[in-house]
Structure formats: structure tokens, C-alpha cells
Regions:
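Active-site loop-to-helix "anion-binding N-cap" substructures in soluble metabolic enzymes
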Residues: 1-117
Length: 117
């Protein structure tokens, strides 16, 4: 499988960017263009203006963040669709909405931007 990935990377050149979260196994890391935490990888995705396809070897929220930050013509792909993060799933919708209401009541509606994990 690694040889096939390397072959595809060679064929696609700058049209392909592979990002791997630092917890990925050594084989995935060996074919990644960048390895790091979710913030660093999102920044690398945003800075890249040549790749048509960005493969994000991480979990849903990481790929979603990269997709928000990249250009409309760039496609962010998550190779393992079942990849999830227990921390990202800790708060349910009711809890998130309650927290949002508390923040709005304390700081106002217009200047509050919650940043979540």
C-alpha cells in the first residue's frame, strides 16, 4: 500500500498534499508532507495554494477545520470516515447551546466567538 501511495504522490505532484496528525502510525507519517497537531496541520492546509486534493490523516473535526480554511476549489479528504475524537464528542447539543447562551449573556452577542476542540 505504501508503494502505491508513493506512486500516486509522484504522479500528482503539487496537486496532492498529505497531512498526518502526530498520533498516526509510522507508515502513514512516512508518506505525509506534514506531521503535527491539529492547529499546525490546519495552518499548513490554509497556506497551501497548489494542492487540489488535501488528504487529512486525522479525525473529523481536523478535516472540517482544514476544509473551512482552504480555497473552494480544494477538496479535503478524510481517508478513515469512522475516525472520531472522544473529546470532540463530550458535549451534546444541549450542553453546547447552554454554554453559548451563557457566553452571550456575559459578553454580548456580537463579539463572542467560541473556539472549541
Amino acid at each position: 500500500m505504501l508503494n502505491k501511495i508513493k506512486e500516486i504522490k509522484k504522479e500528482m505532484g503539487d496537486d496532492l498534499l498529505i497531512l498526518a496528525h502526530h498520533y498516526q502510525n509510522d507508515q502513514i507519517v512516512s508518506v505525509a508532507d506534514y506531521v503535527g497537531d491539529s492547529l499546525k496541520l490546519a495552518q499548513m492546509a490554509e497556506k497551501n495554494k497548489t494542492a487540489k486534493y488535501i488528504v487529512f490523516c486525522g479525525v473529523h473535526f481536523m478535516a472540517e477545520t482544514a476544509d473551512i480554511l482552504t480555497e473552494d476549489w480544494q477538496k479535503v479528504l478524510l481517508p478513515a470516515l469512522t475516525a472520531g475524537c472522544p473529546m470532540a464528542n463530550m458535549a451534546d447539543l444541549d450542553q453546547a447551546e447552554k454554554a453559548w447562551e451563557l457566553l452571550k449573556a456575559e459578553f454580548g452577542d456580537e463579539e463572542t466567538v467560541p473556539v472549541t476542540y
